[in-house]
Amino acid sequence: MARYRHSRSRSRXRYRRRRRRRSRYRSRRRRYRGSRRSRSRRRGRRRGYSRRRYSRRRRRY
């Protein structure tokens, strides 16, 4: 556990440099209108996505 704590403090630093890049990414993401929606969509894809796709195909036929 102590080892993990040490690595965490080390990443902090690193996070500071990363923060600058993240702000730029955020501004670009803000341009997209459904950024929040895309996130939820990703979650749905992970949960039983194949099943939804199959049902859609069946409906089309």
From Swiss-Prot:
GO terms for biological process: cell differentiation; chromosome condensation; spermatogenesis. Testis. It is found in: Nucleus; Chromosome. GO terms for cellular component: nucleosome; nucleus. Residues 1-61 are annotated as: Disordered. It comes from the Eukaryota. Protamines substitute for histones in the chromatin of sperm during the haploid phase of spermatogenesis. They compact sperm DNA into a highly condensed, stable and inactive complex. This is Sperm protamine P1. It comes from Potorous longipes (Long-footed potoroo).
